[in-house]
Amino acid sequence: MKNFAYLKGAVLFGATSALIGCLPPALGQPTNSMPPVSERPKRPTPPTRDPHTPGYVTATELPDGEVPAADAEGNFIIGATHHAAPEMVAQTNVPQGTVYNFTMSSADSKIFPGIARDPNTFGTGDPIDPTRMVVTTSHPEAYTRRVAVYVPQQYVPGRVAPFIVGADGPDRMLFTALDNLIAEHRVPVMIAISIGNGSGDAQGSERGLEYDTMSGRYAEFVEQEVLPLVESKYHVTLTTDPEGRATMGGSSGGSCALSMAWYHTDLYHRVLTYSGTYVNQQWPHNEETPHGAWGYHETLIPNSAAKPIRIWLEVGDRDLLNPNSMHDNMHDWVVANERMAQVLAAKGYHYQFIFARNAGHTDRAVKQQTLPEALEWLWQGYQPPAK
């Protein structure tokens, strides 16, 4: 493992919010008929969805440029202009946290030893059961993942700290927002752990296995293999109270963030997702959850007692629509997130749902506009332990 650290300066680092969750353009074709990547046509731009479409949730439309209040619950529509919030710019008069980086090798993992698809190959829809994806080119393969750990300047060594775990790291936008929000006492003094994925995307890849699997496996990986390293390397003490633990991610990283809490409410109670992949993307197929993360709004949340989970979620009006990937009618990200809002409301969850106009999948501008409010909303009601 390699590790190093740097002190965040007064310049906003070029954050990467490309949390990729889309499927390849020709995913429904047999792999042996796939043309070279360079010859495949580009995926058409998704249609722009109207937030007032019949069947969508009833939502409060905010003036352009505004975001909901940090204590507001329910459904909101934000306008087409997405300026970065002031908290997304590093301030010279604000204490800057330190970001440490280290790498993890698949050779050291008992939970995720590593898989990958052959280059330029994808799955094909099962001709008998359109809800299944057939992948024949996935094989064991090693990987190295990067982990970034943000420790705020206000952290007192030895004190138990709340924390947030993020997918598809490193997420430097998160670290900048936390610097400013912590300084303004709008969120608790917390550690942020931004974990890189194990490479690839979608069915048959390591990232797909980690993020799209409907189980507590990824939460267990974080608990058993990541958090102990964070504590030992950087001399921080992470809380074991699920009220002081949050997860976040975009696309498949978003559905993964929910899975971490859903399957392990003993570990996490707070979830934040951008363009969550609440669609049928799980592989390998699991008869217990045959429709993958589409099952959250289809059966799991409606048919289960409400869990102690607080969730903030967002979708863009031009978010992903992949109707031909598996011909299962379960690959519309806008519909999936709209239905998430419906079932969360019906079950009495504390949630805030944002429908963003003029926004694509895991839209960077939307994240820069909304992340400070989202984080402040996420940590509402948290009571830090007595000093």
Language model: regions and residue ranges:
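Bacterial N-terminal signal peptides
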Residues: 10-21
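Non-catalytic cap/lid and distal C-terminal segments of serine-dependent acyl enzymes
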Residues: 46-50, 54-56, 62-387
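A short, flexible low-complexity segment enriched in Lys/Arg and Gly/Pro that occurs
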Residues: 34-46
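N-terminal secretory signal peptides that target proteins for export/translocation
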Residues: 1-7
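Boundary at the C-terminal end of the N-terminal hydrophobic targeting segment
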Residues: 26-30
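Alpha-helical and His/Cys-centered functional microenvironments
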Residues: 10, 33, 365
